[in-house]
Amino acid sequence: MKKLISPNQIGFMKHMGTQDHVFLLQTIVEKVVKKNKKKLYVVFIDFKKAYDTVNRNRLFDKLRKLGINGTYMKNIEAMYKRTEYCIKLKAVHTPPVLSNLGLKQGCPLSHMLFNLYIDDIKDIFDDRCEPITVQNTKISHFLYADDLVILSKSKEGLQRCLDKTHFYSKINLLTISVKKSKSMIFNSSGKFIRNITFHIGDEKIEPVQEFCYLGIDFKCSGTVKHGANVLNDKGNKALRPLMNVIARFKIPPKTAIKLFHTYISPIITYNTENLSKFSDNEIKKFKDDGIFEATAKSKIDTTHRKLLKFIMGVSRSCPNLAISGDTGEIPLSLKSYRLTLNFWHRVTNMDNDTLVKKALLENISLRTNWIITIEKLINTLNIADKIDDPSKFRHATQESLERKWKTWWRQALDNPELSRLTFYREIKNEYGYEEYLNLTNFHQRKLVSKLRCSDHALEIEKGRHKPANVRKRKEERFCIYCDKNAVEDEKHFLYDCTLYDELRKQYHIWRDETYALFLKDNLSETKDFIFKAFSLREENVPSALSG
């Protein structure tokens, strides 16, 4: 298959994906626009119902010219000898209609046949089209199935390409949707150049300032439109109905997390292989834990954390360190780094004649931020010795990312400058999913989560959010429910406050060196005590305030 099809076409090809051509386009933009400060003229072509309008006789002629004969060719012709279609209306089918055009829908062979049908488009482009050179290879176009990108160094060259493409489509009975096709002029100033236009036949192609190519929004400046933000917004939109389902059917947290990674995570991490790169400033100040500091603030994790906080029942302001620690979830931004490294490793081992491999070599010669990020990640994760073995490299990448993230998490949690999570530091020994999250009663789960993660209404936290003119220092946020003149923190609430003395007698709650394990080892008593204690606290608010 690869021998018959040009490397410019990667649609439905084994070991190839949309990220390959996104990477190729980004590389060309990086070289022409950002490094050489020149304009790049591009048209994104949309074929109208390309699969449905393939001329079968012309397809068979092309297959024979490619050397496909004998039994294989006879079988293909037999498949299309008599093709009938009908429409199902409820339980009734319309009379069958014969069809002499198009490829069969749902047939696994159709993708390959279409690739072979359109592959000879490569022969129409020549040097007068003024192609872009990447690693000594001239590129005037590339395809992902029927998504065609045509590009040139000049407006004259691009128009010449379009004239040839228009003629090609006529001969091959393909229809170009001019309304859906768009032109863009990439330039270093980022200006929307609308006075230079292109046409297909007599129809003008609409110039645009940005275009969504294979799911990624490119701007005429050459940048990707808020890459991580856009993907996160798409994920957030898909999360809302999932959260409704979780709440309606009371889906357990573990199952909810699995659903998130099945349906939402792929949306957020789509094509992040090309987005995972540090800025110039980040690279300059990069240090060993730099990727983890960036991860803690990454916007790509916003939707993920939103789901975790939702199933835990905590507020948006609940510390992310506690959310990660109690769910045991690894941030999606780290997954994007893993995907980036795996993508780089896959392309590194490709044949040199593939366009994406040439794009990688171009990145290396240009010393782009993307390549520098790859180098930084490999050095930080200490996985350079695993590069020669694909399976070991993938495993080592994931293992090292998770291990170093957990180490960074513990160090961040133990930071003495972190005023919040004092109680959490004492009760949380290891990074991982906590059993209390399996509580089926959401209100009980919520109360335990809030107490553990410093997201409660005790004075130690409540006082933090008061206006500056009445806010008290941490050591002055006293409990108003007893006369011990003590700070109302988690330990005081659990063990010391006299308001709950009678309640404690109903449970095996005591203070000794093992108290930090209480919330974990005595879960059945913990949830009941916390629930009743907070209820008692609410009942006594008026009298406490008056006293």
Tell what function each PLM region has:
Residues 414-417, 421-547:
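Family-specific functional microsites
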Residues 1, 25, 46, 63, ...:
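Mobile genetic element proteins and their domesticated derivatives, centered on retroelements
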Residues 261, 287-288, 296-304, 315-462:
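Extended C-terminal regions of large enzymes
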Residues 10-20, 32-37, 47-53, 65-68, ...:
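Conserved, non-catalytic sequence blocks in retroelement Pol enzymes and Pol-derived host proteins
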Residues 1-116, 120:
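Conserved pre-catalytic core of RNA-dependent polymerases
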Residues 91, 175-209:
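Short, conserved micro-motifs composed of acidic
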Residues 6, 13, 145-146, 177-182, ...:
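Non-catalytic, peripheral interaction segments enriched in hydrophobic/basic residues
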Residues 49-66, 141-170, 187-189, 220-224:
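Catalytic palm subdomain of template-directed nucleic-acid polymerases
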